[in-house]
Structure formats: C-alpha cells, structure tokens
Amino acid sequence: MAWTSLILSLLALCSGASSQAVVTQESALTTSPGGTVILTCRSSTGAVTTSNYANWVQEKPDHLFTGLIGGTSNRAPGVPVRFSGSLIGDKAALTITGAQTEDDAMYFCALWYSTHF
C-alpha cells in the first residue's frame, strides 16, 4: 500500500454586518492517510464563540463544494463522522480523525457576526 500525504489548504471567510472582522486560518496542513488533523479559525475581534455559528466548507479540486459543519459543531447530513466541529480555546476547530485520501481539499471557515441597531 502506497502512503501519500494529504495537503489540506485553508481559506477564511467572514459573513455578517461587521466588515471589520478578519478571520484567519493556517495556510496549509499535511497529514498521512489515517492521521488526525485539526484546522482552526481565529477572529480578529476576539474569541470565537457559539454565537459566531462557525461553519466549515470543503472544496474538492473539481470545485465541488460540500458543507461539512454548521453552527460550530453540527455535522451536515451525509458527512462522515471523521469530521467534527468544536471550539478550542478562542478558536473554532474542524477535526478530521482518520483522514482519507479523498479528504485532500481546500477547507473554508465562515463566521457570523451581527450588529445590533
């Protein structure tokens, strides 16, 4: 069996009424099939909380987008259990436990910010 590395590229998105927040993630992470990787998402406005409703989206090389996690930790229907969302410290996190070669993709984090009038 040939072992290959998975390169997980990350981009960050920000949605909501506040245009001043900056969301940052690692630029790339690598693991081997069967490995565990934790991708994190940080906000410039402070700690990420459940009120930010962190969402994680996967983009495959053929530009197919799949919503993985919504509302910080809710796995979308049909998403394998190896994907999980959580908060770690002041960041949102996507954990891939037992990574598979088909997980080689871009991963996007989106946070919700609302402004009260």
UniProtKB/Swiss-Prot annotation:
InterPro entries: Ig-like_dom (IPR007110), Ig-like_dom_sf (IPR036179), Ig-like_fold (IPR013783), Ig_V-set (IPR013106), IgV_Light_Chain (IPR050150). Keywords: Adaptive immunity, Immunity, Immunoglobulin, Pyrrolidone carboxylic acid, Signal. Residues 1-19 form the signal peptide. GO terms for biological process: adaptive immune response; immune response. Disulfide bonds: none annotated. Residues 20-117 form the Ig-like domain. SUPFAM superfamilies: Immunoglobulin (SSF48726). Pfam families: V-set. PANTHER family: IMMUNOGLOBULIN LIGHT CHAIN. GO terms for cellular component: immunoglobulin complex. This is Immunoglobulin lambda variable 2. It comes from the Eukaryota. The modification Pyrrolidone carboxylic acid is found at Q20. The lineage of its organism: Eukaryota, Metazoa, Chordata, Craniata, Vertebrata.
